Amino acid sequence: MSTKMTNKKEVAIDAEQSTANQVLREILTGSPVRTLLSILVGFLVGAIFMVAFNPEVLNAMSYIFGRPADAFAAMGKTISDGYGALFRGAIYNTQASDFAAAIRPITETLRFAAPMIMAGLGIGLGFRVGLFNIGAVGQMAFALIGVTYVSTRIELPFIIHSLVAIIVAVVFAGAWGGIVGYLKAKTGAHEVIVTIMLNYVALNLFTFFLRTPGLLLEEGGAGTPKSDPPAETAALPNLFTDEYRLHWGLVLAVAATFFYWWLMERSTIGYRFRMVGFNSSAAKASGIRVERTFVWAMAASAAFAGLAAANQGLTSVGGVTPSIHANIGFDAITVALLGGSRAGGIFLAGLLFGAFKAGGPAMQVVGVAPEILNVVQALIVMFIAAPPLIRALFRLPQPPKRKPISEIGRASCRER
């Protein structure tokens, strides 16, 4: 009787996993055309919001029938001012007095993009295995406990100090993520629920360590949760002069992107990850230990979030605070979705969202509310996550349907 119940439970879990994997494949295998159209629609809707709430446009609309040219001119000026400010704040400042100041925006975009790329790679890895890792924020927080301790409490030589801190961050985050994989493998607990709950645990643990004397609280601190700045031997140095804040975190992000590509596309373990993500039942039948794969996949996914934590912790000039994670773990979900969980796509998506963060303040200067840019980001992700919607809007063709694994196997047997 118990064996039958166990078999029914396994069938139900496999069915749930298969449905989730089908949804993920539909989202992640979208064409570049659909991605570009999603971005375009997001910017168009953002332009509508800018126009709809601009006082000059509303004033011109009051007499549009008498002088329609004024209304259209006000609309054009509002949109060009808004997105022009985004360009100047994120790519190249055409109003700067010298070249060094003009290229500062692109360095800020790269600086903001680096941690989102690294965390996005981790989320994307989980997606490729059919796992929804919603816990990158908690994994970063737990990793920050280790990286902050190493960078502020331990003395090591230059370069070695940074490397040890990065390794500790990866190990801490990987262990925290491995807990999720273990619980899923042994108890069937859903990774979404577990990661959300562990986010709270890790964030509160991190704050407790920052608030407690003798742990991570800064020397002479009065109880405000804040650590000392990382030691000079541990801090990631700037890539260029002190005029720019871009640091070696960008190099770390590029290296992580190449490693992710090799891991998922060329390595044996990456092949197992993809097999389990495509069809866990078929993977199990072929001899792959699915439960063990879940554990390793969640650990690897979290390890990339640990790199993002190292990026944040080793560049905090004023010391680490509880908000240093900056919700990068949640932004990474959108980056992974937009990038289709592929290495190159995630890198480009990280650059786009880094540009949003770098250019947002410039848009506020010209009167565009920051919430409008958030709406643009949300709409882009919504269209990426709802393929039928963007196909209906632009009348794109339906993607070819994949044959089930069982049918492919029967067909190959008949040919033999």
Please describe what each predicted stretch is.
Residues 113-124, 139-145, 174-178, 197-200, ...:
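Hydrophobic alpha-helical segments embedded in the membrane of multi-pass proteins
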Residues 85, 199-266:
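Transmembrane helix-bundle core of multi-pass membrane transporters
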Residues 175, 242-319, 343-344, 348:
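Helix-loop-helix "hairpin" substructures at the membrane interface of multi-pass membrane proteins
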Residues 1-42, 46-55, 278, 285-293, ...:
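Cytosolic-side transmembrane-helix boundaries in multi-pass membrane proteins
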Residues 3, 7-8, 16-116:
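Membrane-interfacial amphipathic/re-entrant helices at transmembrane-helix boundaries
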Residues 49-51, 55, 80-154, 170-192, ...:
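Single transmembrane alpha-helix segments in multi-pass membrane proteins
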Residues 299-378:
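Transmembrane alpha-helical segments in multi-pass inner-membrane proteins
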Residues 30, 34-35, 108, 112, ...:
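Alpha-helical transmembrane segments of multi-pass membrane proteins, especially transporters
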